[in-house]
């Protein structure tokens, strides 16, 4: 998206239409607000299941000892912590996040747990990654893509920084597949979740946005096609918990 088109175009922020140039600021405000309670937010949104989803996401990644991994939207460091055990002493991880508050929480948490070796923290925008071409074996993004303004550009950037033979994996809230469950899920998302956000964090608006952002995120087949358009091959996805989340993957050849 060019600078001139960004000034005139609009995009969604939850269910609101906003100027594309303003979305990054609005999203930043949300995550600055919830950064210290980010795990609580995910617990409320997923009823605690997000921890199992993340473990499965990393366990099924084709990551091996010695790999160099970029974890985008690295947040509070959950994925980096799991990946560190997989890449071993010779591997390295770059934890990237556009939000300084989230990055600070992740850094503090990993340092407190003694995870310091061969781990780098970079504040970066997924739409303009500050890395050379073909420098990572694996790129991951967990619960972050739906907050990106220009998802197509972010996917192309993920493709660019991957080595040939590398894999990109995206874990994201997606489209529920069971019709009978959709009303229950909607009730939890739009009625229960904002109230819990207010009760535990005195912040209903941020939690309402996060629920809305899930509904605006591309469904599984559309995101798979977007990854293909970005250059990835062997694109596919796996639904977890009835499509509440999906793991998308693609390879660079």
Curated annotation (Swiss-Prot):
PROSITE patterns: SAM_MT_UBIE (PS51608), UBIE_1 (PS01183), UBIE_2 (PS01184). One of its GO terms (molecular function) is 2-methoxy-6-polyprenyl-1,4-benzoquinol methyltransferase activity. InterPro entries: SAM-dependent_MTases_sf, UbiE/COQ5_MeTrFase, UbiE/COQ5_MeTrFase_CS. S-adenosyl-L-methionine binds at residues 76, 97, 125-126, 142. It catalyses: a 2-demethylmenaquinol + S-adenosyl-L-methionine = a menaquinol + S-adenosyl-L-homocysteine + H(+); a 2-methoxy-6-(all-trans-polyprenyl)benzene-1,4-diol + S-adenosyl-L-methionine = a 5-methoxy-2-methyl-3-(all-trans-polyprenyl)benzene-1,4-diol + S-adenosyl-L-homocysteine + H(+). Keywords: Menaquinone biosynthesis, Methyltransferase, S-adenosyl-L-methionine, Transferase, Ubiquinone biosynthesis. Pathway: Quinol/quinone metabolism; menaquinone biosynthesis; menaquinol from 1,4-dihydroxy-2-naphthoate: step 2/2; Cofactor biosynthesis; ubiquinone biosynthesis. GO terms for biological process: aerobic respiration; menaquinone biosynthetic process; methylation. Its EC number is 2.1.1.163, 2.1.1.201. The keyword tRNA processing does not apply. It comes from the Bacteria. Methyltransferase required for the conversion of demethylmenaquinol (DMKH2) to menaquinol (MKH2) and the conversion of 2-polyprenyl-6-methoxy-1,4-benzoquinol (DDMQH2) to 2-polyprenyl-3-methyl-6-methoxy-1,4-benzoquinol (DMQH2). Belongs to the class I-like SAM-binding methyltransferase superfamily. MenG/UbiE family. HAMAP family: MenG_UbiE_methyltr. This is Ubiquinone/menaquinone biosynthesis C-methyltransferase UbiE. The gene is ubiE.
């Amino acid at each position: 998206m060019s600078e001139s088109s960004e000034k005139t175009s609009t995009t969604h922020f939850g269910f609101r239409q906003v100027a594309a140039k303003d979305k990054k600021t609005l999203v930043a405000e949300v995550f600055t607000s919830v950064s210290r309670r980010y795990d609580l937010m995910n617990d409320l949104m997923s009823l605690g299941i997000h921890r199992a989803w993340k473990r499965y996401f990393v366990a099924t990644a084709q990551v091996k000892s010695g790999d160099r991994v970029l974890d985008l939207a690295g947040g509070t460091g959950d994925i980096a912590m799991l990946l560190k055990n997989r890449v071993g002493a010779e591997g390295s991880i770059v934890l990237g996040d556009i939000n300084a508050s989230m990055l600070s929480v992740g850094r503090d948490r990993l340092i407190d747990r003694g995870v310091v070796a061969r781990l780098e923290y970079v504040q970066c925008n997924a739409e303009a990654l500050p890395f050379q071409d073909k420098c990572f074996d694996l790129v991951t993004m967990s619960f972050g893509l739906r907050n990106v303004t220009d998802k197509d550009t972010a996917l192309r950037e993920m493709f660019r920084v991957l080595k040939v033979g590398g894999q990109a994996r995206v874990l994201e809230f997606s489209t529920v597949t069971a019709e009978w469950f959709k009303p229950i899920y909607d009730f939890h998302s739009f009625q229960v979740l904002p109230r819990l956000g207010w009760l535990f964090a005195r912040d209903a608006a941020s939690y309402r946005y996060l629920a809305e952002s899930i509904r605006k995120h591309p469904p599984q087949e559309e995101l798979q096609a977007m990854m293909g358009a970005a250059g990835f091959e062997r694109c596919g996805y796996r639904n977890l918990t009835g499509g509440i989340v999906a793991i998308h993957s693609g390879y660079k050849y």
